[in-house]
Amino acid sequence: MSTEMLGLILAGGKGTRLGKLTSDQAKPAVPFGGRYRIIDFTLSNCANSGVKNIGIITQYQPLLLNEHIGNGVSWGLDGLNASATILQPYTDNSGSKWFEGTAHAIYQNIDYIDSKDPEYVLILSGDHIYKMDYESMLEEHIKNGASLTVAVIDVPMKEASRFGIMNTDVSGRITEFEEKPEHPKSNHASMGIYIFNWKRLREVLTTGFTTNDDMVDFGKNVIPYYLKSDERVFAYHFSGYWKDVGTIDSLWAANMEFLDGSDGLNLYDRSWRIYSKNPIDPAQVITENAEVNNSMIVDGCYVDGTINHSILSTDVDVQRGSEITDSVIMPGVKIGKDVVIKHAIVGENAQIGDGAVVEGNKDNIKVIGNSERIGVLPNED
């Protein structure tokens, strides 16, 4: 059956700047906002936009991510005319190898894409926090008679040199692409979201480059090729909330923004829900000794200490006398008695022993890795 627009989520990133938090899982699988994982936002955008057939391209440490996505039922992607397909690197008679970049990952999955027979392909990153209607982007793509549409967001001019910058004419047609320019001409930053006409992209990927080494990334290789070939390439301007949470500081800050409800993402919007695979946990327990101020305590938590301006994800235990401030505690963490945690991110299933101090500051967030053990734990003294 033909699919008008097929979604392809690039979810194989290692996320090296997140350090300990991605030592055993891909960046899109990192928890966010108490009950979500980063990839939930892209998957939910697809579901809410009516993009019901999605390929998720994974590579680095995919086990947890694959288990989280499953057959896509949590996002309504398991119906008769819907699907969520995990796509991993494989070897065939041509000697295929690891995905070397964004464009190469799509090239290696041409057979899957052809099986869906799409008119358009929507290529997405699985590691950003945002809400976006891809249907509106497709409508503009068709209206412009575009061969490629690139989603862009305006960033402060002083930060533009950190991004791939799209320079456009008055009609919104992209005339020039600059990868992290020293002296940017505009502030239209690429979001790494693309809509391509599939037949043309397929032709470019299979015949447009001399070797696979010339066809690694969309930003470095494919977009410049389209512009050089005078293809109709347009910018789609997005003005909503969008965060790249690829560093410890940005991940911590985005969680705090969500908690404050200032310019952060509204996760309580019933017209555009963010879905996730959530276990069925008992209600949280907050004892009479506990004190909670401006914090989020998710299902399955036990709190017998003081929580200030922090997020406690599912199944977190905080024993008596402990104090947590300005911190993000990820799922399954066990915190003993009289512990102090400030300006920190504590990774999944970590254990913090009695009396331990985990303290950073706004300019230097302290990180405890997944399953890391700190201090003296019960039965170890």
UniProtKB/Swiss-Prot annotation:
Keywords: ATP-binding, Carbohydrate metabolism, Glycogen biosynthesis, Glycogen metabolism, Nucleotide-binding, Nucleotidyltransferase, Transferase
Source superkingdom: Bacteria
Binding, alpha-D-glucose 1-phosphate: 164, 179-180, 190
Pathway: Glycan biosynthesis; glycogen biosynthesis
Gene Ontology MF annotations: ATP binding; glucose-1-phosphate adenylyltransferase activity
PROSITE patterns: ADP_GLC_PYROPHOSPH_1, ADP_GLC_PYROPHOSPH_2, ADP_GLC_PYROPHOSPH_3
Pfam family membership, one: NTP_transferase
Gene3D superfamilies membership: Hexapeptide repeat proteins, Spore Coat Polysaccharide Biosynthesis Protein SpsA, Chain A
Enzyme Commission number: 2.7.7.27
GO biological process: glycogen biosynthetic process
Catalytic reactions of this protein: alpha-D-glucose 1-phosphate + ATP + H(+) = ADP-alpha-D-glucose + diphosphate
Family stated for the protein in its record: Belongs to the bacterial/plant glucose-1-phosphate adenylyltransferase family.
Physiological role: Involved in the biosynthesis of ADP-glucose, a building block required for the elongation reactions to produce glycogen. Catalyzes the reaction between ATP and alpha-D-glucose 1-phosphate (G1P) to produce pyrophosphate and ADP-Glc.
Subunit description: Homotetramer.
Name of the protein: Glucose-1-phosphate adenylyltransferase
Organism whose genome encodes this protein: Lactobacillus acidophilus (strain ATCC 700396 / NCK56 / N2 / NCFM)
